[in-house]
Regions:
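Short, amphipathic alpha-helical interaction segments positioned at domain boundaries
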Residues: 2-38
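Beta-sheet entry/capping signal
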Residues: 3, 81-82, 213
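Catalytic cores of enzyme domains
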Residues: 29-181
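Local cysteine-cluster metal-coordination motifs and their immediate loop/turn environment
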Residues: 85-93, 155-168, 190-204, 220-233
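Ferredoxin-like iron-sulfur electron-transfer modules
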Residues: 145-152, 172-201, 205-223
Length: 234
């Protein structure tokens, strides 16, 4: 509901545990998911994704503007904790794809990750907002991550892409790991020049080209908005 409330002891305990063990958890889940994808065992993947979505953090895809608004909201705190560190998926799987330092952690999430990993560095609210705008230019989708399907225990703004991001790949395989945000893209077909840039930038294959004009399948759109700033038809 947009209100700031004190973090409970259980929230902090869960986040501290997950922060310390996230690389190991990601490696195990990545190997397990790959194994069952190879077997084409969709019923098992369905159960696995629901379990992951229940006991592990889940993501809500949002626009960069909403992520920046959230930074402004938490900036009213007496001590605003914001930090940035390595992409945990890249760190855990020892792979690199694009920007490495892009995991923005906030409030008690910032405290937990700074304690667990020396790579995490403090950010001012203005620095965090500038980074989010930079990530948008790179085509990364901002995603609010919260614990235990709470939707309110937000501890991180991940900036995800599809090649290595484990939650994204797990969601593509079985669902129930990432959720669409409150926005969807609206297209004015009269202004579209058919360049196809939005198709290349869309992570969810919501944009397609038909008779030289882009079409948006809004049921597939998760509302990240990364296709908007590069639209040549404006």
């Amino acid at each position: 509901n947009g209100k700031l409330v004190p973090a409970s002891r259980i929230q902090v305990t869960i986040d501290n545990f997950y922060a310390r063990n996230e690389p190991m958890i990601l490696r195990v889940l990545d190997a397990t998911t790959r194994f069952f994808v190879k077997l084409r065992a969709r019923p098992v993947l369905w159960v696995l994704s629901r379990l992951m979505g229940t006991v592990l953090p889940t993501g809500e895809v949002v626009t960069t503007e909403r992520a920046i608004d959230f930074i402004d909201t938490i900036s009213v705190l007496d001590k605003t904790e914001i930090a940035v560190g390595p992409c945990m998926c890249q760190k855990a799987l020892q792979k690199r794809s694009g920007t490495y330092i892009k995991d923005v952690v906030i409030i008690y999430g910032a405290e937990a990750y700074k304690m667990a990993y020396p790579e995490y560095k403090d950010l001012s609210p203005d620095e965090a907002k500038a980074l989010l705008r930079k990530f948008q230019e790179e085509g990364l989708m901002p995603t609010f991550y919260s614990c235990l399907r709470s939707g309110g225990w937000i501890y991180a703004i991940c900036n995800c892409e599809g090649k290595i991001c484990f939650p994204f790949r797990a969601h593509q395989a079985a669902g129930a790991v990432m959720y669409p945000g409150p926005d969807v893209v609206s297209l004015n077909s009269d202004e579209c020049i058919g360049c196809g840039t939005c198709i290349d930038r869309c992570h969810f294959s919501a944009n397609t080209l038909f008779n030289g004009t882009c079409k948006v399948e809004q049921t597939k759109c998760y509302g990240c908005g990364v296709c908007i700033p590069t639209c040549k038809g404006q």
